[in-house]
């Protein structure tokens, strides 16, 4: 069912357009990954970098909190094509369009309560050891 306004515009021969990316009019801007960032953390509910479990993971990766860029899945879509950085997805299943090693885990609350999920996260980190700990030979 079309609205009266739509009908009137159609009668006047005015073509209506719809935006493919409405966020572009709402101040959406492209995000760049700063050079000092070594890890992009992606979650719907971003955890505090001071959380004990998050701190343990960052320490194991030899990454300081200032080298972490926290983004929601919606913000990841705003990264330029070809962006490269290692990433940790918490509670998001969809792979990122971000080049680099990607480790995935359940959301932090689930990760905290599930030793099997924590072990799986550590296993992924070991799998991508050469990406997280590059050797400068």
From Swiss-Prot:
EC number: 2.7.7.7
UniProt GO BP: DNA replication; DNA-templated DNA replication; response to radiation
Record's GO cellular component terms: DNA polymerase III complex; DNA polymerase III, clamp loader complex; replisome
Domain of life: Bacteria
Main enzyme class: transferase
One Pfam family of this chain: DNA_III_psi
Annotated disulfide bonds: none
InterPro entries assigned to the protein according to its UniProt record, in alphabetical order: DNA_pol_III_psi (IPR004615), DNA_pol_III_psi_sf (IPR036654), DNA_pol_III_psi_subgr (IPR018382)
GO molecular function terms noted in the UniProt entry: 3'-5' exonuclease activity; DNA-directed DNA polymerase activity
Catalytic activity: DNA(n) + a 2'-deoxyribonucleoside 5'-triphosphate = DNA(n+1) + diphosphate
Alphabetized UniProt keyword annotations: DNA replication, DNA-directed DNA polymerase, Nucleotidyltransferase, Transferase
Family of the protein in this entry: Belongs to the DNA polymerase III psi/HolD chain family.
NCBIfam families linked to this entry: DNA_III_psi, PRK06856.1-2, PRK06856.1-5
Subunit text: The DNA polymerase III holoenzyme complex contains at least 10 different subunits organized into 3 functionally essential subassemblies: the Pol III core, the beta sliding clamp processivity factor and the clamp-loading complex. The Pol III core (subunits alpha, epsilon and theta) contains the polymerase and the 3'-5' exonuclease proofreading activities. The polymerase is tethered to the template via the dimeric beta sliding clamp processivity factor.
Entry function: Part of the beta sliding clamp loading complex, which hydrolyzes ATP to load the beta clamp onto primed DNA to form the DNA replication pre-initiation complex. DNA polymerase III is a complex, multichain enzyme responsible for most of the replicative synthesis in bacteria. This DNA polymerase also exhibits 3' to 5' exonuclease activity.
Protein name, per record: DNA polymerase III subunit psi
Taxonomic classification: Bacteria, Pseudomonadati, Pseudomonadota, Gammaproteobacteria, Enterobacterales
Gene name linked to the record: holD
């Amino acid at each position: 069912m079309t609205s009266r306004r739509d009908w009137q515009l159609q009668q006047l021969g005015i073509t209506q357009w719809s935006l493919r990316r409405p966020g572009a009019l709402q101040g959406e801007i492209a995000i760049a990954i700063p050079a000092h960032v070594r890890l992009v953390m992606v979650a719907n509910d971003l955890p505090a970098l001071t959380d004990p479990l998050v701190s343990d993971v960052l320490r194991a990766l030899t990454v300081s909190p200032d080298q972490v860029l926290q983004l929601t899945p919606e913000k990841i879509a705003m990264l330029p094509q070809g962006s490269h950085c290692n990433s940790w997805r918490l509670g998001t299943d969809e792979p990122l369009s971000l080049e680099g090693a990607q480790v995935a885990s359940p959301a932090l609350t689930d990760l905290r309560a599930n030793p099997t999920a924590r072990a799986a996260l550590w296993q992924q980190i070991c799998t991508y050891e050469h990406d997280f700990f590059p050797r400068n030979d």
